[in-house]
Amino acid sequence: MSRSTALLPLLLLSTAAVAHDHDHLHYQATSPAPAQSAPQRTPAERNAVITATLPEDQAAMKAHVMFLASDAMAGREAGTRDYDIAAQYVAAQFYAAGLRPGGDEGGYLQKVPLVAYRVADKGSAMWTPAGGQPQELVFGEDFVPSPVPNAKETSLSAPVVFVGHGIDAAPYGLNDYKGVDVRGKIVAFLPGTPEGLGGEERAFFGSAANKAALAAARGAVGAIQIDMPRAGGRQRPFATLARYYDAPRVTWANPDGTAHAMTPATPVLGTLSQAGAAKLFGKGWDAVVKAAASAKPAYKPLVARGALTVASKTGFKPMDSGNVIGLIPGSDPKLKDEVVVLSAHLDHIGTNDGGEGDRINNGALDNAIGIASLIEEAKRFKTAATPPKRTVMFLAVAAEEKGLVGSDYFANHPTVPLKSIVADVNLDMPILTYKFEDMVVFGADRSTLGPIVRKAVGAMGLPVSPDPMPEEGIFVRSDHFRFVQKGIPSVFLWPGQAGPGKAAVADFMSHRYHKVGDEIDQGIDWSQGPRFVSVNYAIAREIADAPERPVWNKGDYFGTLYKGPMAAK
């Protein structure tokens, strides 16, 4: 799973997120916590744990994780040979399970043309006040540039308008654009969101990419973020941004070799410091600083009298990867052309640079065990007494840890008609180190998938519990959200936190998440693997065989925003 938006430095909020709208979640420029590996054992002791005899169904899941989370896979980072080997393994398992290929040219693989992009120089920024002389904005003191995904060179000059947090969310009583004309202008906004938004909404509206999209829809020609520690929750000095200004980002490539951008006509140009903002907005900026320090900040629009000119260069490096796709055709004459997608990400974060000792982030729970569940779920479908009524797609995606890139590529280049996809059920990082007593299904309350999920989970003797971490905004942080952005009802499954779950999840997230300790011998309860698969299968089967396709609940924000099928009442 991608990192929480709360953990991201401002740099990535203003740059990496422009290509992938969760500020994603997946980038890591924060200082890493000290690595904690699995309990120290001798090689013989470790092998005894790994090779311990298990029942056949548990051993089948463990075998997948043994391979995918082995040191030989070097952390399965997308764009590497190690990931490619892992993808071939999944393709072979899909073949062995009897799935039909659903990728390119009759195969199981869908090529995903990844591209890394980064600022190629420090660029330049110049502020020319109305009737005054040009003033340079000093790199690292006033301004830090962002890479522009879809252009090797960028040069833009336009007036600037400050619009608070840059949010327009009418259902929540927020509209920073009220009475403001930003056509032909550069929009400047603060990071983060106002207080009072729920976790999912806060994560969504706080995304720099989504803010740029709002600006683009209103005719803005560019966007720039303004550093405000109180407003964005960040306490690092602005100079820290300069150290990471040229850190690479990853997305999928356009045919010309540039990178995909959500808002190609409205690039995020970089980040202004408070000193830089003061140069643009003069004494008017004092009111913003004062408001940011208040208990309940409220910002008024500001127009900078003059023009901001920004020039920068972006470099690109291609690095191919791939999704893995298998299909079980539907059996019902009326429903077989509709597709239920079951997704899980195959990649992890690779190896740590430098240092001594273990440097491999094996990703056993994140997300080798999710892929193992997907493979075993495919076997359940193939060996069932009757085939599903709808077609079921098993989708192992690349580059989730880079910003949901593989799923975004698939959503924009589907191998089946996009309109035929009726739902996505996503598996990402099930923490199976305890006997789970409930299930958490993120997004269940947003569509008619909710009753389907509750029926299936209830038949397994388990309750569906509410989101235990609403502040994390998990619904917008994994691959299913790329389907949501296409208007497709989607859910994301996790074992719940009842009983021992809360302590187990906290232990994993604190000590092994995105660290070298996420290994096969960390204490996984393999008896829970088949249970988790059974729950997933029951949910997917209910969706695949339901007489009606899922629709969004009437008035749901994301269903409305992305124009998905909506319930009548």
PLM features per residue range, with description:
Residues E45, P129-A130, F139-G179, T258-G363, ...:
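Soluble metallo-hydrolase cores and metallopeptidase-like ectodomains found primarily
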Residues L137-V138, K152-E153, K178, A253-A287, ...:
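Metal-dependent peptidase/peptidase-like ectodomains
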Residues H20-A86, V90-P101, G276, D337, ...:
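N-terminal hydrophobic or amphipathic helices/low-complexity stretches enriched
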Residues N47-P55, D71-R81, P113, G123, ...:
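Second-shell loop/turn segments in exported
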Residues A74-P194, V303-A304, F316, D320-N323:
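Noncatalytic luminal/extracellular "stalk/propeptide" segments of secretory-pathway proteins
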